[in-house]
Amino acid sequence: MHPDLIPAKAFCASHAIEQSFIQTLYESGLIEITFIEEDPFVPAAQLEQLERIVRMYFEMDINVEGIETIVHLLHRLQSMQQEMNVLKNRLRLYESDF
């Protein structure tokens, strides 16, 4: 078995959700799924994001389209924060020359 892959069936059972929900997230591009002999597996690296999405959907009652928007905005925010850090470091470099 692959230690970096979690069976979608096991994830769904432990979170009491339908496997079709995982399929919907995959079809919308929110998560990646690896298929081994037709069985879906979720990469362990995506487990945190998948659990966050499950909470948004079931606990906060946000639909898949809303989750897509939130995930997109979070990625943009993270990208902007990284860019801001690069610019701050560059500014520090110029300020230290004086």
Annotate the PLM regions.
Residues 1-21:
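Polyanion-binding surface elements
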Residues 2, 28, 32, 39, ...:
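Arg/Lys-rich, alpha-helical DNA-contact motif
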Residues 19-35:
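Major-groove DNA-recognition helix of helix-turn-helix-type DNA-binding domains
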